[in-house]
Amino acid sequence: MDNVKLVKNGVLRLPPGFRFHPTDEELVVQYLKRKVCSSPLPASIIPEFDVCRADPWDLPGNLEKERYFFSTREAKYPNGNRSNRATGSGYWKATGIDKRVVTSRGNQIVGLKKTLVFYKGKPPHGSRTDWIMHEYRLSSSPPSSMGPTQNWVLCRIFLKKRAGNKNDDDDGDSRNLRHNNNNNSSDQIEIITTDQTDDKTKPIFFDFMRKERTTDLNLLPSSPSSDHASSGVTTEIFSSSDEETSSCNSFR
């Protein structure tokens, strides 16, 4: 599917009715990890763009929607690890603590998510805006056998819509369940998981050609011939080994 080009001139172009709404785990495992490992992507849907080359309102794409970019981190100082996040009109400033992104099956740590807020002006006297960036990076470096790789990160950028009395440090992301550790140490990290085990959260599928309702996704007809009025819904089972392994060889 990598041959399907959904990005034109740095702008995401999806067919009518399609939405790109990935989870944190999908962004890290299916896109960022494959990009770092130079493996085929599920689709050419995320453009490469240095997000610090332009102010957030000048980045390619629709300002009213979330925008995704593969970007590289430029060191602020020659021998330092801090990233240079200055733009023409301001700078991106990290807020809160980095959050671990874990797999929904196995709870394996696959990446880290950093939240940044855009400030207009020069530090430390810049004025805060409502522009938010989620910067995803892998939790571990690729194996040395892969050779030198670029310092890729995946960025999600959007304009936060303010609602009354919300915490200023709220990153506007409600996709995942968050489990906070009460430890107040400076290296505290929140864990993000996409697993939902509560039966109430399972979708209910209705087969309008049958009288029974199926609430268990694993309940399938024993034989196609046993019910000629079946809706024809099939279930695909994916192995979690490709997602949970830390090696880039899983994509080859």
From Swiss-Prot:
Residues 213-226 are annotated as: PEST-like. It comes from the Eukaryota. Its main location: nucleus. It is found in: Nucleus. Transmembrane segments: none annotated. Disruption phenotype: Accelerated leaf aging. Gene3D superfamilies: NAC domain. Residues 14-160 form the NAC domain. The keyword Repressor applies. Expressed in xylem and phloem cells in roots and inflorescence stems. Highly expressed in senescent leaves. Expressed in roots, and abscission and dehiscence tissues, such as axils of bracts and abscission zones in cauline leaves and siliques. SUPFAM superfamilies: NAC domain (SSF101941). GO terms for cellular component: nucleus. One of its GO terms (biological process) is xylem development. GO terms for molecular function: DNA binding; DNA-binding transcription factor activity. Keywords: Activator, DNA-binding, Host-virus interaction, Nucleus, Repressor, Stress response, Transcription, Transcription regulation. Induction: By abscisic acid (ABA) and salt stress. Interacts with NAC007/VND4, NAC026/VND5 and NAC030/VND7. Interacts with the mungbean yellow mosaic virus (MYMV) AC1 replication-associated protein. The NAC domain includes a DNA binding domain and a dimerization domain. Transcriptional repressor that negatively regulates the expression of genes involved in xylem vessel formation. Represses the transcriptional activation activity of NAC030/VND7, which regulates protoxylem vessel differentiation by promoting immature xylem vessel-specific genes expression. Transcriptional activator that regulates the COLD-REGULATED (COR15A and COR15B) and RESPONSIVE TO DEHYDRATION (LTI78/RD29A and LTI65/RD29B) genes by binding directly to their promoters. Mediates signaling crosstalk between salt stress response and leaf aging process. Over-expression of NAC083 inhibits protoxylem vessel formation in roots. This is NAC domain-containing protein 83. It comes from Arabidopsis thaliana. The gene is NAC083.
